[in-house]
Amino acid sequence: MDVIPSTTPGEAVRISAKRTAELFGPEYLMVTPSASNGSIGVSYRRKTEYEHVKELPPALAAKQAQAAAARSKRPKISSRSEGSGSGDKSGASTALVRRGGRASGAAGDDKPTSLIQRPSATRQQPPEWHAPWKLMRVISGHLGWVRSLAVEPNNEWFASGAGDRTIKIWNLATGALRLTLTGHISTVRGLAVSPRHPYLFSCGEDKMVKCWDLETNKVIRHYHGHLSGVYTLALHPRLDLLVTGGRDGVARVWDMRTRSNIHVLSGHTGTVADVQCQEADPQVITGSLDATVRLWDLAAGKTMGVLTHHKKGIRSLATHPREFTFASASTGSIKQWKCPGGEFMQNFEGHNAIINTLSVNEDNVLFSGGDNGSMSFWDWKTGYRYQTIDTTAQPGSLEAEAGIMTSTFDRTGLRLITGEADKTIKVWKQDDQATPETHPVTWAPTLGRQRY
């Protein structure tokens, strides 16, 4: 006969409570397993499962050794100040100024930085002061809308193409007509003067791209391939390449001398309205009426990126002459981008019109011309609009003909040339009498900047 061991009432209560918890209690009432038991199981599994990979391969071991050696060579920042002596055994620092330039006893050390620092929106870069622009000269002679302009590299003359199917050469200093070139059978939409050759390139709505020899004033080459009107062209600054774009929705890259079509840059679903070539990178930038900007790798002839931030058709592009940036314009919107990847930088807000043309000079002045005759001048760095004026249609023209069709700065950046719908060419210059006191910058930082 078994003898039941005697238990005290307290022990019986603990045993009963333990049994009840094991049977009916939730997981958080269960007895915690011993840590030693878990470590034994982990060590056993490590030994049985990872025995064959305990040693790293020689190549990986050498790579990790090099990384460890590089980390050990980095200078370590000691917790003490450099001026403390070797006999200082106490843990307290004797430095008067903490690392970071703040005094050790300064008030508010434990305050969050958000209460001390200003928001980034209120620390915007102030715009640079620019002199306002005023009308200098009005040049008449064309019988149609002036749709294209190009300045000669030596800054002695400029060319204009218009709806009267002619190209006219003007003296930049006096505005006198020097020459008229005929050959197109429709509106001349694009002009470019080669900086290395005595060539003038033109394109028009007659599907033609022509190369003019300025020594004989005759056409020496035709570039055939476009299926519809050619609206824009650009020369690569370093290579003998010509890029054209038009209503057929493609941009074509031509060898200037052999007239061969090197690439057909297809991808746009609308008219290619403007083309720019990037000097520091073999890249072509195209803007289209399908509201996209495409960045093309000129070597491969393929798309590098598509910028879809605009909501309406893009009619003009402008690359900065010295910086690695460019701008694009659509109806009521101008955006600035970074090359070569097309990272968005900022908006130029305020020009509510159909923007036909953009131009930028080396002094960081951006000009935008609208279909309704509105003109805006911007600071390229900050996007601040420092001047707005409206052009005036010439006597005998309709009010609806007060539109800016094309624009360009001369080689010095001190003269702005605009081609307008009233069949005139206007030359603008900066006001020599203006000072920061007479025309102050009325700028205030914006708290909420529109991202895209």
Curated annotation (Swiss-Prot):
This protein's record includes keyword Lyase: no
WD repeat boundaries on the chain: 141-180, 183-222, 225-264, 267-308, 310-349, 350-388, 399-438
InterPro entries referenced in this protein's UniProt entry, alphabetically: G-protein_beta_WD-40_rep, Prp46/PLRG1-like, WD40/YVTN_repeat-like_dom_sf, WD40_repeat_CS, WD40_repeat_dom_sf, WD40_rpt
GO cellular component term of the entry, any: cytoplasm
Superkingdom of the source species: Eukaryota
Disordered: region residues: 61-129, 432-452
Polar residues bias locations: 114-125
Protein localization: Cytoplasm; Nucleus
Keywords linked to the UniProt accession: Cytoplasm, mRNA processing, mRNA splicing, Nucleus, Repeat, Spliceosome, WD repeat
Residue ranges with Low complexity bias: 61-70
The protein's assembly and partners: Associated with the spliceosome.
PANTHER family, per the entry: PLEIOTROPIC REGULATOR 1, WD40 REPEAT PROTEINPRL1/PRL2-RELATED
Protein family per UniProt: Belongs to the WD repeat PRL1/PRL2 family.
Job of this protein: Involved in pre-mRNA splicing and required for cell cycle progression at G2/M.
Protein name: Pre-mRNA-splicing factor prp46
Species of origin: Emericella nidulans (strain FGSC A4 / ATCC 38163 / CBS 112.46 / NRRL 194 / M139)
Phylogenetic classification of the source organism: Eukaryota, Fungi, Dikarya, Ascomycota, Pezizomycotina
